[in-house]
Amino acid sequence: MDGTEIAVSPRSLHSELMCPICLDMLKNTMTTKECLHRFCSDCIVTALRSGNKECPTCRKKLVSKRSLRPDPNFDALISKIYPSREEYEAHQDRVLIRLSRLHNQQALSSSIEEGLRMQAMHRAQRVRRPIPGSDQTTTMSGGEGEPGEGEGDGEDVSSDSAPDSAPGPAPKRPRGGGAGGSSVGTGGGGTGGVGGGAGSEDSGDRGGTLGGGTLGPPSPPGAPSPPEPGGEIELVFRPHPLLVEKGEYCQTRYVKTTGNATVDHLSKYLALRIALERRQQQEAGEPGGPGGGASDTGGPDGGGGEGGGAGGGDGPEEPALPSLEGVSEKQYTIYIAPGGGAFTTLNGSLTLELVNEKFWKVSRPLELCYAPTKDPK
């Protein structure tokens, strides 16, 4: 020994003193007799007992423990390099704990950031969703089986005094040549001046007052749309084929509303619409009423209708306009025919979404029938 010192890097030193099985510093070193690979005593004995009768490093055959021998010289070398084995192991445990804690904190922070990012993305998608003019709007057009040609289908029954509150243009709907128009005699009397028959609708001259309606108040312009718990329901509203006579006021209506609207809402809406349309029909016949003169397009006596006359004082008295205050959802009953031609009366508290799921169950607009209630209470 001449006292020569050789510098060895900690990395290479650690690889020489490490057990290939537990990847820790060798303890009670055992060396194979044939290939001279070193392992911890407990590690190699456990490997042999598990049935793996070969060297874990080079796969050379190891019959039993007799193929191993202890290596006290290597243990002495390790004790020279690391005099305090317990201190080294304690330091190693502290490093592992610190690394584990740091890794857990990083994983937690990354998880929180990912959650915040996903929430922000979903929130932005909800904000960017297109806002219609009013989510509670019911789109309706008149006709005897086809949508009528109403030029302004967006009247709000519940707020007639604020027509400017409806924002934006209405969505386009299919137009058909149904019997939705009405002809008004310009020189007619009180009853003979209206020539549209049952189901007529003066939607063009009234600017959309008969074309549509809502089941609730409209949303102001720019306001966020209210939540839609039940989505939207499209339905076809027809008169009852057995309970509604042809001479009565009846027409097919096409309605689009929210799924949380009830059958009572539809009944009240229908009563309001029919009362309003009858009132406007009577208003359209006022030019030929009492006191009205002859017209070029009227009858030979200038009356233009059954109740009109050349002199205003001799004609029948003008009937009073129907009031909208007494309108009730009890005036009309709603029916549904799930199949087989049998009509079922719907309870007023049922929502349209529940009716669609319980009675309809087909992929086309919900079809309902209406008829005047015989004994409204």
Swiss-Prot record:
Gene Ontology biological process terms in this record: chromatin organization; negative regulation of DNA-templated transcription; protein ubiquitination
Positions with biased composition (Acidic residues): 146-158
Residue segments, region Disordered: 119-234, 280-325
Region Necessary for transcriptional repression: start-end pairs: 1-205
Biased composition, class Gly residues, residue ranges: 176-199, 206-215, 286-314
Enzymatic reactions: S-ubiquitinyl-[E2 ubiquitin-conjugating enzyme]-L-cysteine + [acceptor protein]-L-lysine = [E2 ubiquitin-conjugating enzyme]-L-cysteine + N(6)-ubiquitinyl-[acceptor protein]-L-lysine
Biased composition (Pro residues): 217-229
Presence of the UniProt keyword Coiled coil in the record: no
Residues bearing PTM Phosphothreonine: 186, 191
Keyword Cytoplasm belongs to the record: no
Annotated segments matching region Necessary for interaction with CBX2: 201-377
Superkingdom of this protein's organism: Eukaryota
ZnF segments: RING-type: 19-59
Pathway assigned to this chain's UniProt record: Protein modification; protein ubiquitination
Matches recorded under InterPro entries: RAWUL, RING1/RING2, Znf_RING, Znf_RING/FYVE/PHD, Znf_RING_CS
Localization per Swiss-Prot or TrEMBL: Nucleus speckle
UniProtKB keywords: Chromatin regulator, Metal-binding, Nucleus, Phosphoprotein, Repressor, Transcription, Transcription regulation, Transferase, Ubl conjugation pathway, Zinc, Zinc-finger
Enzyme nomenclature, EC number: 2.3.2.27
Main location per the UniProt record: nucleus
Chain positions found as Phosphoserine: 9, 111, 158, 161, 200, 203, 219, 225
GO molecular function, one term: zinc ion binding
One cellular-component annotation, GO: ubiquitin ligase complex
Motif Nuclear localization signal per UniProt: ranges: 172-175
Its job: Constitutes one of the E3 ubiquitin-protein ligases that mediate monoubiquitination of 'Lys-119' of histone H2A, thereby playing a central role in histone code and gene regulation. H2A 'Lys-119' ubiquitination gives a specific tag for epigenetic transcriptional repression and participates in X chromosome inactivation of female mammals. Essential component of a Polycomb group (PcG) multiprotein PRC1-like complex, a complex class required to maintain the transcriptionally repressive state of many genes, including Hox genes, throughout development.
Subunit composition and interactions: Component of chromatin-associated Polycomb (PcG) complexes. Part of the E2F6.com-1 complex in G0 phase composed of E2F6, MGA, MAX, TFDP1, CBX3, BAT8, EUHMTASE1, RING1, RNF2/RING2 MBLR, L3MBTL2 and YAF2. Interacts with CBX2 and PCGF6. Component of a PRC1-like complex. Component of repressive BCOR complex containing Polycomb group subcomplex at least composed of RYBP, PCGF1, BCOR and RNF2/RING2. Interacts with BMI1, PHC2, PCGF2, RNF2; CBX6, CBX7 and CBX8. Interacts with MN1.
Protein name: E3 ubiquitin-protein ligase RING1
Gene: RING1
